[in-house]
């Protein structure tokens, strides 16, 4: 672990890698692109139910992580896209809660302590406040069922009826979660930008993260998704782009790489061209190491 830190500095930078062939393959794929962090799905993200993780797969995952120096703090599992923890219909809500608890249990089996998820949608059937309260209740139920795993709420772009695009939404959910030590936030730069929080310049970043700190609190930031945006500012549309090639530009990502407030948490690429992930990781790391050397 020490060697890894010396080589990579204090930034945990990686990408959302494939778990095809088994979750134990994900850490190997992360290392292939020079990552010291990674995200993965622990099951097929487009299915409600998956077969349980096999003991040999769990052992192989843990062994590969240990061999490559990945600790739980380096890894950000993502739940299924089907789950809506704020679903207004009882049947869909029950199904979503059961699936979310299963995702948490899988994380626990793998020795992982973070679970990243999209908060939920009101589908124009209940108020925003009711939906946010339902999301918080869903988190509380999962916490009571599964120990240790932190529920990491991802901010959204605000497409359709998705909640979580306003920092106030995140704060309102957290306020109603009983175990504050087991809830956090993952800020996606593309979602933040298209939701209406500017990130194009260093000054914009200062303002946006000051607002996040005031409304939610930087101490709740447990991970980030680093994505540029194909679509314009405040468009409420979620379309990722490669770093520096979209509407946000490199200044934002240089800012994050150089700012120590973003040290020690997974910084995960979900950019559109896996062929250049290694290049993107290297550029971010160069920014970070340059900042350290200039201290």
UniProtKB/Swiss-Prot annotation:
Database matches in Pfam families: AP_endonuc_2 (PF01261)
Free-text remark on how the cofactor is bound: Binds 3 Zn(2+) ions.
Family, similarity comment: Belongs to the AP endonuclease 2 family.
Entry cofactors: Zn(2+)
Gene Ontology biological process terms in this record: base-excision repair
A GO molecular-function descriptor: DNA-(apurinic or apyrimidinic site) endonuclease activity
Ligand binding (Zn(2+) 3): 191, 238, 240
Organism of derivation: Vibrio parahaemolyticus serotype O3:K6 (strain RIMD 2210633)
Reaction catalysis annotation: Endonucleolytic cleavage to 5'-phosphooligonucleotide end-products
Residues the entry annotates as binding Zn(2+) 2: 154, 188, 225, 270
Name the record gives this protein: Probable endonuclease 4
Cited InterPro entries: AP_endonuc_2 (IPR001719), AP_endonuc_F2_Zn_BS (IPR018246), Xyl_isomerase-like_sf (IPR036237), Xyl_isomerase-like_TIM-brl (IPR013022)
EC number: 3.1.21.2
Binding residues for Zn(2+) 1: 78, 118, 154
Function according to Swiss-Prot or TrEMBL: Endonuclease IV plays a role in DNA repair. It cleaves phosphodiester bonds at apurinic or apyrimidinic (AP) sites, generating a 3'-hydroxyl group and a 5'-terminal sugar phosphate.
Keyword field: DNA damage, DNA repair, Endonuclease, Hydrolase, Metal-binding, Nuclease, Zinc
Keyword Lyase on entry: no
Gene3D superfamilies per the UniProt record, alphabetical: Divalent-metal-dependent TIM barrel enzymes
């Amino acid at each position: 672990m020490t060697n890894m830190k010396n080589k990579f500095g204090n930034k945990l930078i990686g990408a959302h890698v494939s778990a095809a062939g088994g979750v134990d393959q994900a850490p190997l794929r992360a290392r292939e692109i020079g990552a010291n962090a990674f995200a993965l799905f622990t099951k097929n993200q487009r299915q409600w139910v998956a077969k349980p993780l096999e003991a040999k797969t769990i052992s192989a995952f843990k062994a590969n992580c240990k061999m490559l120096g990945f600790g739980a703090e380096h890894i950000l599992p993502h739940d299924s896209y089907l789950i809506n923890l704020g679903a207004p219909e009882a049947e869909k809500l029950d199904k979503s809660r059961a699936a979310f608890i299963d995702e948490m249990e899988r994380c626990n089996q793998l020795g992982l302590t973070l679970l990243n998820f999209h908060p939920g949608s009101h589908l124009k059937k209940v108020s925003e406040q009711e939906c946010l309260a339902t999301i918080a209740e869903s988190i509380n139920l999962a916490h009571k069922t599964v120990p240790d795993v932190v529920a990491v709420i991802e901010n959204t772009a605000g497409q359709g009826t998705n909640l979580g695009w306003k920092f106030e939404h995140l704060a309102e959910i957290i306020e109603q979660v009983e175990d504050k030590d087991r809830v956090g936030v993952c800020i996606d730069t593309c979602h933040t930008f298209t939701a209406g929080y500017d990130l194009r310049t260093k000054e914009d970043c200062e303002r946006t993260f000051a607002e996040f700190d005031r409304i939610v609190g930087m101490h709740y930031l447990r991970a980030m998704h680093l994505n540029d945006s194909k679509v314009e500012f405040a468009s409420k549309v979620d379309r990722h782009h490669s770093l520096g090639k979209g509407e946000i530009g490199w200044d934002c990502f240089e800012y994050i790489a150089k700012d120590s407030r973003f040290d020690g948490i997974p910084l995960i690429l979900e950019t559109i061209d896996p062929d250049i992930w290694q290049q993107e990781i290297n550029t971010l790391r160069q920014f970070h190491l340059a900042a350290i050397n200039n201290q």
